[in-house]
Amino acid sequence: MDLKTTVLHITDSFTDEEMYCLLFLINGCIPRSCNAVNISDLIIETLSKSTQWDICLMQCLYVLRKIGLLLNLFQVTKEAVKQSFFTQPQLETHVLTLVNVNNNLTAKDEKRLCFILDQFFPRNVAAPSVILCVFSNMLCEMHVLECLCQLKKCLKQIGRSDLAKTV
C-alpha cells in the first residue's frame, strides 16, 4: 500500500469541505496558504512524517464516518465481500468494532496483542496495525466471526476484558 496512491484514491470522492476536515484531523490546523488545489499534497506531506500513516488515515476516516473508504483502505474489494458471505453493511460494522478497539489500545497492549495474534494471523499485509492485519485475515481463510472470537480471547488474555466486551 503506497501512501500517495492510497490518499489520492481515497480523497478522489471527497468534497472540498471533507478535504479540509481530513487535513484538520491529520495536521491539527489548516495552514493559511492552503487551498483546494494543494490540499492533497499537504495531507500526503503530513502523513509521510508518520511511520503508521495507515492507522492515522484509518482513524480519520472513522471520525469522518467514511466507512466505505475504510473498507477501501483495508483493500476490501467487491469480490472479497462476496467471498466472505457478508454484506457491505455487516463488514462496515466489523470495521467500526475493530477501529474502536484499535483506538483504545495502548502501545504496550498492541505489542502484546501482536505477539499473541501472530500465532493465528501471520502478517500477510504490509501494514503494522494489528487491526489491519486481523481484518485482512478475516476476509481470507478464517470465518469473520471466528476471527472476532479469537480477537476477543486475545484481548482477555492481555487483560483488556473491557475491550473484549465491545467485540
UniProtKB/Swiss-Prot annotation:
Keywords: Repeat. Gene3D superfamilies: Death Domain, Fas (1.10.533.10). It comes from Saimiriine herpesvirus 2 (strain 11) (SaHV-2). InterPro entries: DEATH-like_dom_sf (IPR011029), DED_dom (IPR001875). Residues 2-75, 93-167 form the DED domain. SMART domains: DED. This is Uncharacterized gene 71 protein. It comes from the Viruses. GO terms for biological process: regulation of apoptotic process. Coiled coil: none annotated.
